[in-house]
Curated annotation (Swiss-Prot):
Family: Belongs to the class-II aminoacyl-tRNA synthetase family. AsnA subfamily.
Natural source organism: Streptococcus equi subsp. equi (strain 4047)
Transmembrane segments: none
Reaction(s) this enzyme catalyzes, per UniProt: L-aspartate + NH4(+) + ATP = L-asparagine + AMP + diphosphate + H(+)
Record's protein name: Aspartate--ammonia ligase
Pfam families: AsnA
EC numbers for this chain: 6.3.1.1
Keywords for this protein: Amino-acid biosynthesis, Asparagine biosynthesis, ATP-binding, Cytoplasm, Ligase, Nucleotide-binding
């Protein structure tokens, strides 16, 4: 049992260390330290889809403030790029840890404990567009493939990802599969192409519903991208043969500018957020134009090591029936 446990840990560390090295080199970002707590009221917390409740923390020696365990560092990263004067094309990545206790379900792919490579870059002048989004997606996808090939060489786990990733808009997906749910559409397109970047998540689609929810104040999901389609963000999905389903590795996007922020808070009814310090800074032009996202570390390890449950690659909390069902839960 000890030998198996140690081997399991070595595999996880190999995936994380290898991916980190490739990501820093290929994406040209610097690794920095990030916070676990966010001060309530400054607007820095990631509100995700807007319904999740964060973990509240009271610090004994800071009695006049309340803090929350971060959901992600989406807005902190942009603030930090501005604070320290990062230039166009430069960026950072954080080994982020977070808690999301309001996850809809604790299942094979969802945990209350979140670990991500949380990254952000300043967009070069004139490149706040779909072409730059796609270029960045292709760079990160190359990092995934390089890591998969390294895992294959070390552990004899066959590489399965295609050389190229397929891009498709959520509007195209609705037209292609009008009778399917968003999840069923993801399964259908990902099973066909094995690796897909789904563009435009958050805005209302021709069927009257968004593909999925997104907060209004980090990704730009309303600007026109091309051919009448909207959204400069998306998800990377791969086909997971172990689970027989599409598997989201991470979300990313070009971040809101002043106009997109105002437009999106009007759509979601979150205009009160514009009174927060973070949002005022953005509206006053104090933040650079950026692109960023969060790459799930445990999800990456789970996929590349062909595990059937995320609890096999991270230590979290689970109902007893999960531990009874899966032998290798950590």
């Amino acid at each position: 049992m000890k030998k198996s446990f140690i081997h399991q840990q070595e595999e996880i560390s190999f995936v994380k260390n290898t991916f980190t090295q490739y990501l820093i080199a290929k994406l040209d970002v610097v690794e920095v330290q990030g916070p676990i707590l966010s001060r309530v009221g400054d607007g820095m917390q990631d509100n995700l889809s807007g319904v999740e409740n964060p973990v509240s923390v009271h610090v004994l020696n800071i009695p006049n403030a309340t803090f929350e365990v971060v959901h992600s560092l989406a807005k902190w990263k942009r603030h930090t790029l501005a604070r320290f004067g990062f230039n166009e094309g430069e960026g950072l990545v954080v080994n982020m840890k977070a808690l999301r206790p309001d996850e809809d379900s604790l299942d094979q792919t969802h945990s209350v404990y979140v670990d991500q490579w949380d990254w952000e870059k300043v967009i070069p002048d004139g490149q706040r567009n779909l072409a730059y989004l796609k270029e960045t997606v292709e760079t990160i996808y190359k990092v995934i493939r390089l890591t998969e090939l390294a895992v294959e060489a070390r552990y004899d786990i066959e590489a399965v990802l295609p050389k190229k990733i397929t891009f498709i808009h959520t509007e195209e997906l609705v037209a292609r599969y009008p009778d399917l749910t968003p999840k069923e559409r993801e399964n259908a397109i990902t099973k066909e192409f094995d690796a897909v970047f789904l563009i435009g998540i958050g805005g209302v689609l021709p069927d009257g519903k968004p593909h999925d929810g997104r907060a209004p104040d980090y990704d730009d999901w309303t600007s026109e991208s091309e051919n009448g389609y909207h959204g400069l963000n998306g998800d990377i999905l791969v086909w997971n043969e172990q689970l027989g389903t599409a598997f989201e590795l991470f979300s990313m996007g070009i971040r809101v500018d002043e106009e997109a922020l105002k437009r999106q808070v009007d759509i979601t009814g979150d205009q009160e957020r514009l009174q927060f310090d973070w949002h005022k800074s953005l509206l006053n032009g104090l933040f650079p134009l950026t692109i960023g996202g969060g790459i799930g570390q445990s999800r990456m390890a789970m996929f590349l090591l062909r595990k059937k449950h995320i609890g096999e690659v991270q230590t979290s909390v689970w109902p007893q029936e999960v531990r009874d069902t899966y032998d290798n839960i950590l």
